[in-house]
């Protein structure tokens, strides 16, 4: 590999699968997917580690597969984090500009963001991201970059995302036990937004729903900035469980039935279509209609969308969504999902998948890989100082790896 080539690795640690995406970037800035690894996820529930050793083994399988395909060793990753422990809040900071000539410098921007971060956070929680939404200079709002402007008073409106310390700590430990450095932790819907949303959608207003196995992650964008994030504690695994109970069949059989025959909107499925459900415990096989299967799936999918819509409606965000709703994640591939979402949200809905990359990009042009590809894109932008999200570490600290003892030092 040429010396001028940079390598970036995204690790999507999901409830049902783990994906490792490897990309390289040449001197011209073009990103090419060069390695992909997937493994069934074991040891996690709703994005939270419940069995460390099983999680480590799953990570190793996905990373080993990606390494073999890419032909290079993987030393560290940008990892996704999700789960119903995630919380978010909007905050504002205010400072007086420090220079005598009233010119705003980078140090002023850092100070005002630190002021905005000065909120009461429980000891068992940690800041994951601090995302500037806009700056206000002497009551002039809507400013994206105030450096070089003149003013006496500088304000910043930021979006702060926090997570449970133990949950973040266990994700990091699992990755490190797999022999890898953690260069960055990125909230999964924010990573996915890199891969599936365009600048126009972010400006116009859009809600992104990442329909995963254990959770559904919600992110609302307006005027180019993140305005709200939330986690709905239901996903594709709940649909599978509903099918298993309704058809009295094992989870693995229910998952296969969901993938092959599932539909989220019963009205779109003919009553005449049928499928075979394998008998268990010596019972004979039986035939059911696909419409009956869809009628088992639809209530859960509707519940997910209703809960997500409640989040979107908070603080009247729904009035800002000129770009409608974008669905991504593995569960979004189910037939009828877009149509059902349009009924619940009462606005245009589209499916989002990663686009515009080189190399093996055709292999990841699928909603299931949005988070993994988004993590790679985030890492590439952070490498040149273009990241959209801030955390507690400098670029140098990020490249050196995630220091658990330092990040969680407040607890000890």
Model regions: which residues?
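A structural feature that tracks compact, well-ordered secondary-structure segments
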Residues: 218-219
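A cytosolic small-molecule/anion-sensing beta-strand core signal
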Residues: 222
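Nucleotide/phosphate-binding catalytic cleft detector across ATP-hydrolyzing
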Residues: 1-15, 21-208, 225-226, 236, ...
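Conserved Rossmann-like nucleotide-cofactor binding loop
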Residues: 16, 214
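ATP-binding/phosphotransfer module of carbohydrate and carboxylate kinases, centering on a glycine-rich
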Residues: 306, 310-324, 334-351, 380-385
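Hydrophobic, well-ordered secondary-structure elements that form the walls
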Residues: 308, 327, 375
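Glycine-rich phosphate-binding loops at beta-strand->alpha-helix junctions
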Residues: 17, 82, 163, 262-265, ...
């Amino acid at each position: 590999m040429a010396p001028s080539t940079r390598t970036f690795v995204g690790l999507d640690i999901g409830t049902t699968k783990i994906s490792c995406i490897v990309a390289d970037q040449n001197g011209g800035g073009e990103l090419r997917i060069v390695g992909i690894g997937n493994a069934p996820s074991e040891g996690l529930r709703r994005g939270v580690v419940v069995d460390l050793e099983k999680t480590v083994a799953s990570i190793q399988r996905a990373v080993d597969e990606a390494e073999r395909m890419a032909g290079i060793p993987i030393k560290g990753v940008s990892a996704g984090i999700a789960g119903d422990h995630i919380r978010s809040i909007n905050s504002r900071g205010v400072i007086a500009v420090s220079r005598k000539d009233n010119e705003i410098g980078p140090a002023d921007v850092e100070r005002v963001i630190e002021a905005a971060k000065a909120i009461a956070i429980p000891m068992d929680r940690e800041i994951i991201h601090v995302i500037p939404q806009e700056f206000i200079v002497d009551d002039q709002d809507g400013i994206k970059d105030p450096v070089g402007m003149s003013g006496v008073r500088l304000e910043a409106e930021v979006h702060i995302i926090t997570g449970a310390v133990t949950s973040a700590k266990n994700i990091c430990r699992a990755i490190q036990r797999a022999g890898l450095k953690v260069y960055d932790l990125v909230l999964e819907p924010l990573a996915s937004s890199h891969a599936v949303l365009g600048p126009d959608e972010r400006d116009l207003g859009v809600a992104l729903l990442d329909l995963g196995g254990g959770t559904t992650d919600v992110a609302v964008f307006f005027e180019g900035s993140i305005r709200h994030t939330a986690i709905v504690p239901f996903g594709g695994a709940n649909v599978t469980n509903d099918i298993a109970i309704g058809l009295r069949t094992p989870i693995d059989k229910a998952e296969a039935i969901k993938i092959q025959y599932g539909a989220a909107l019963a009205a779109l499925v003919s009553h005449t279509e049928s499928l075979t459900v394998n008998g268990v415990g010596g019972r004979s096989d039986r035939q059911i209609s696909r419409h009956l299967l869809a009628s088992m799936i639809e209530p859960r999918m509707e519940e997910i969308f209703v809960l997500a819509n409640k989040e979107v409606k908070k603080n009247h965000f729904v009035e800002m969504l000129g770009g409608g709703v974008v669905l991504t994640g593995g569960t979004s591939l189910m037939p009828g999902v877009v149509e059902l979402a349009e009924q619940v949200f009462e606005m245009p809905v589209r499916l989002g998948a990663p686009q515009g990359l080189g190399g093996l990009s055709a292999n990841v042009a699928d909603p299931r890989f949005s988070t993994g590809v988004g993590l790679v894109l985030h890492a590439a932008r952070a490498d040149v100082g273009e990241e959209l999200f801030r955390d507690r570490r400098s670029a140098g600290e990020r490249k050196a790896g995630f220091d658990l003892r330092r990040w969680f030092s407040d607890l000890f």
